[in-house]
Amino acid sequence: FLNHSAVNPDFSLLSSMGKSQNFASEFNFFDEEKRAALFDGLYPTTDGDSIIQVLNTKRPNILIILMEGFGGAFVEPLGGLPDVTPHFNRLSKEGVFFTNCYANSFRTDRGTVCTFSGYLGLPTASVMKIPAKSRTLPAIAEGLSKAGYKTDFLYGGDINFTNMKSYLLSTGYQRLTANTDFSLAEQTSNAWGVNDDITFEYLYNQLRNRKEEGPWHTAFLTLSSHEPFEVPYHRLEDKIPNAFAYTDECLGKFIDRLKQTPAWKDLLVICLPDHSFYYPREGSNAMPRFYHIPLLWLGGAVKQPMQVDKIMNQTDLGSHFVGAAWVGTYCIYV
């Protein structure tokens, strides 16, 4: 409690005063025997024929780029609009591209926990806003820290929003960089904080000049592809796809430059969104296409390009790293 009070005392006080909802009874749909049978069936077999090793090193440096709302609606290889994300489309042929990945939620606070802790998003509550729960979750950064990784997180916005700072610190991120670490002009370059071209440039310089001993893990959350979708880029007439095209442009330039640095050789770059985006606004937002998202593994640590069509969920990423990262078993079950 004292740790969370120091991180965000106002939020911790209001959160404690508002504890009145019994989530256990609200979401207990199955008896224990049926739940166990269903849960066991989710685990893949582990025979040799079903496993593909995808990396050429056991302890890569790991960069996770969580792209704001970057859903399949804008990614042509997933059936999305053409010419919105040409850089991502190109990069999808250079790494391990998962074509049947689905988001688990619709908000950044939920999607962040889904991604980094492998914890399902709840429809009526944000686990990130419940410190008593979020601090007990397993997490990618926590597991990697135990394995000797240095960990840090970059976000160009207000890192206290939705209690994000508390969640990130309690789940293993040792250093946080946010909007207040940039100049005032940079902080106000977007309605939500620092525009993506600025944070991508900052990240590039950090990685290019990094001289830490031992492996490291960095996570980066973008923000420009969020309403009101006002960005310093004007390639498409519709401002919504244009905002995603802007983030795609920033991503493409960043990856192309990073390839030319020594950091690329032992690097695993994982690109996925925090959640999808309802566009075009036709039909129900409960349709599967609304949750369809891209997931791409890039970097010098990747053995060879391949496409994985197996259905998976956003939470699978966190579960994979929490269970396997520090023993060097980076594999895909097919």
Locations of regions flagged by a protein language model:
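Membrane-interface segments at or immediately adjacent to transmembrane helices
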Residues: F1-S50
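Solvent-exposed soluble domains appended to multi-pass membrane proteins
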Residues: A36-V334
